[in-house]
């Protein structure tokens, strides 16, 4: 059996920035005194004239990024998700999204899996915040392959993009032939009894859950939803028609994230049971990332339980 490849999506982000730097001299990268952690430090070493560090001033960084974008540059502004989406929300809304500027926000260390840094750094509200902003695209890749493709797709998109990356090394889901398109989900496993729609590191957990459910005689469809906004309504509706029940899985508060986005589509277009796996509207705590994911129910076992419950509601 081949060894499982595990890579943090933040590492893929850093490598993709260097790739873009060689291709496009118009690309500028910014950070807020976290270059080593966000992996933008690699870009800094390669292209020092196109890297700017704002210091611990995320709000200023977003405004400077907006100014650079207004002059025709494509700017990647990087920080931890807590400080990018949380602290700099107003600047993202008014200076970047309102004028629809080409600023791509690289938000690393998202979710519970930040681990020992604790509740102050475990941002489980960022997707909800960014979903509420007009013009904003939200990407949450499942692995390093998809993370790279998200960055490459973001630079081609005209307007702001919020990209969510993790600290924890996660198993590779996709091979090098995988094609990513903004606004499109993709079916990883087909099934007839229940649909599991997952995003980020929960995609791998969804695949494990589907295998375990299969052993119990349950056929689960698994959909990877890397684009949270604009959500792929077509694949959601198609999945509901085929299975009649949905479970969403995300490393985010169940309020305002993937679960809410999917529920909105289902409620409006094809009513069916939808159950959500995610952070149950609570704050995090300090601890090893893998242990915290289990404590907060962000694992295959909880997806399986919700899937069985959803089937009973049909």
Give a label for each model feature:
Residues 1-164, 169, 302, ...:
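Thiamine diphosphate
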């Amino acid at each position: 059996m081949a060894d499982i490849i595990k890579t943090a999506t933040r590492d893929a982000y850093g490598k993709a920035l260097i790739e873009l730097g060689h291709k496009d001299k118009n690309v500028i990268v910014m950070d807020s005194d976290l270059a080593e952690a966000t992996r933008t430090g690699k870009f800094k070493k390669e292209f020092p004239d196109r890297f700017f560090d704002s210091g611990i001033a995320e709000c200023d960084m977003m405004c400077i990024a907006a100014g650079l974008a207004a002059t025709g540059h494509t700017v990647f502004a990087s920080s931890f998700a807590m400080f990018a989406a949380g602290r700099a929300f107003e600047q993202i809304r008014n200076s970047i999204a309102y004028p629809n500027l080409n600023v791509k926000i690289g938000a690393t260390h998202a979710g519970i899996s930040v681990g020992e840094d604790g509740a102050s750094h475990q941002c489980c509200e960022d997707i909800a915040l960014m979903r509420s902003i007009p013009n904003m695209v939200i990407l949450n890749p499942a692995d390093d392959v998809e993370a790279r493709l998200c960055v490459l797709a973001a630079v081609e998109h005209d307007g702001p993009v919020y990209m969510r990356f993790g600290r924890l090394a996660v198993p590779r889901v996709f091979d090098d032939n995988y094609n990513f398109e903004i606004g499109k989900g993709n079916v990883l496993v087909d099934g007839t009894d229940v649909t599991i729609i997952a995003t980020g590191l929960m995609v791998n957990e969804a695949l494990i859950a589907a295998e375990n459910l299969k052993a119990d005689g349950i056929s689960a469809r698994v959909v990877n939803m890397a684009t949270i906004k604009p959500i792929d309504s077509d694949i959601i509706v198609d999945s509901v028609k085929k299975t009649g029940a949905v479970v969403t899985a995300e490393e985010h508060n169940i309020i305002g994230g993937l679960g809410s986005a999917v529920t909105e589509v289902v409620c409006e277009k094809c009513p069916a049971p939808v159950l959500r796996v995610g952070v149950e509207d609570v704050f995090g705590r300090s601890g090893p990332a893998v242990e915290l994911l289990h404590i907060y129910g962000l694992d295959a076992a909880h997806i399986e339980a919700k899937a069985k419950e959803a089937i009973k509601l049909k």
